[in-house]
Amino acid sequence: MSQQNGNADRVGAQGGMEHSFGFKAVDESEKQGLVNDVFHKVASKYDVMNDLMSAGMHRVWKDAMIAWLAPSKRPGWTSLDVAGGTGDIAFRIVEASGRQAHVTILDINGSMLGVGRERAIKKGLADNLEFVEASAEELPFEDASFDAYTISFGIRNVPHIDKALSEAYRVLKPGGRFLCLEFSEVELPVLDKVYDQWSFHAIPRIGKMITGDADSYSYLVESIRKFPKQQDFAAMIEKAGFERVSYRNFTGGIAALHSGWKL
């Protein structure tokens, strides 16, 4: 994308690690709190947010993610969905497994988890799910605990992406699968310009109309532009120890689905 700036974290002039909150440079200690505040504000309208960010395509991309994961229908198969508070991915996994899978939904934001719990009860899926409030950088699970690890539109908000990837590798069983769906770099020049106009001008305005909050939506757009390109993120996944790393672009690169295996 024309405003892509690569990885959000970089070494500053004083030798310390700088972090960004959207396009704004912030201290490492500030970032998580700022991100949490955004998601407290948008939790009740999270599906609306994703519809705005993707023009409704996130539903198609998530279905494709689950198809590529191909959850097992054998009893005892387990999956960890990180930053999955409202349950979109976890619900799909449970249904695709014939309601055999057990999915742990982990999110650092209690408001998001609250929405997920309510939705799970309404869908009759609560028995297949566990909700855990914790950080992606410090997963409260033993080594080799899960058959699959998923994260959808969440990893770009983690202050230390490398730590989250290392933790993903740690908690997966040998032979386990890592899948990450995230907004990415548009690779079609014409679509790039159109998407920039939509993202930076339309989304914050519509977000304000629907939720009364334009700033949160501006941050979410900016955070996409700060996220690593497809190839760079694939290299980070490999560095964490994963093998057979690959990715698929959706809608010209507006989103990308990365895959890796713990072998």
From Swiss-Prot:
EC number: 2.1.1.163, 2.1.1.201
Keyword hit for Endoplasmic reticulum: no
GO biological processes: aerobic respiration; menaquinone biosynthetic process; methylation
Keyword set, alphabetical order: Menaquinone biosynthesis, Methyltransferase, S-adenosyl-L-methionine, Transferase, Ubiquinone biosynthesis
Binding site for S-adenosyl-L-methionine: T86, D107, S152
Function: Methyltransferase required for the conversion of demethylmenaquinol (DMKH2) to menaquinol (MKH2) and the conversion of 2-polyprenyl-6-methoxy-1,4-benzoquinol (DDMQH2) to 2-polyprenyl-3-methyl-6-methoxy-1,4-benzoquinol (DMQH2).
HAMAP family the UniProt entry points to: MenG_UbiE_methyltr (MF_01813)
Protein name (Swiss-Prot/TrEMBL): Ubiquinone/menaquinone biosynthesis C-methyltransferase UbiE
